[in-house]
Amino acid sequence: MAKQSAIEKDGVIVEALSNAMFRVELENGHEITAHISGKMRMHYIKILPGDKVRVEMSPYDLSKGRIAFRYK
């Protein structure tokens, strides 16, 4: 069986949690917990509350995600 692709949504950082985790409010109003992707961590991209981001979520668990991109 083929692996299902990630779901991408845009959202806004609401709160910074510990261990590089963030609470993100998606466009549809849902709040999820997300962590920073490895490339963003490697390039020291800072994320602050209020930043607009793109989040990738697994179709199997829609309450968690990975922050893939921070909009300028």
Swiss-Prot record:
- Provide the coiled-coil residue spans: none
Fetch the Pfam families from UniProt: eIF-1a
- What positions does the domain S1-like occupy? 1-72
Write out the GO MF terms.
ribosome binding; rRNA binding; translation initiation factor activity
Which InterPro entries does this entry report, sorted A to Z? NA-bd_OB-fold (IPR012340), RNA-binding_domain_S1_IF1 (IPR006196), S1_domain (IPR003029), TIF_IF1 (IPR004368)
Q: Which UniProt keywords apply?
A: Cytoplasm, Initiation factor, Protein biosynthesis, RNA-binding, rRNA-binding
What subcellular locations does the record give? Cytoplasm
Per UniProt, subunit arrangement is: Component of the 30S ribosomal translation pre-initiation complex which assembles on the 30S ribosome in the order IF-2 and IF-3, IF-1 and N-formylmethionyl-tRNA(fMet); mRNA recruitment can occur at any time during PIC assembly.
Which family is this protein grouped under? Belongs to the IF-1 family.
Q: What does this protein do?
A: One of the essential components for the initiation of protein synthesis. Stabilizes the binding of IF-2 and IF-3 on the 30S subunit to which N-formylmethionyl-tRNA(fMet) subsequently binds. Helps modulate mRNA selection, yielding the 30S pre-initiation complex (PIC). Upon addition of the 50S ribosomal subunit IF-1, IF-2 and IF-3 are released leaving the mature 70S translation initiation complex.
Name-wise, this protein is Translation initiation factor IF-1
Native organism is Parabacteroides distasonis (strain ATCC 8503 / DSM 20701 / CIP 104284 / JCM 5825 / NCTC 11152)
Tell me what gene encodes this.
Answer: infA
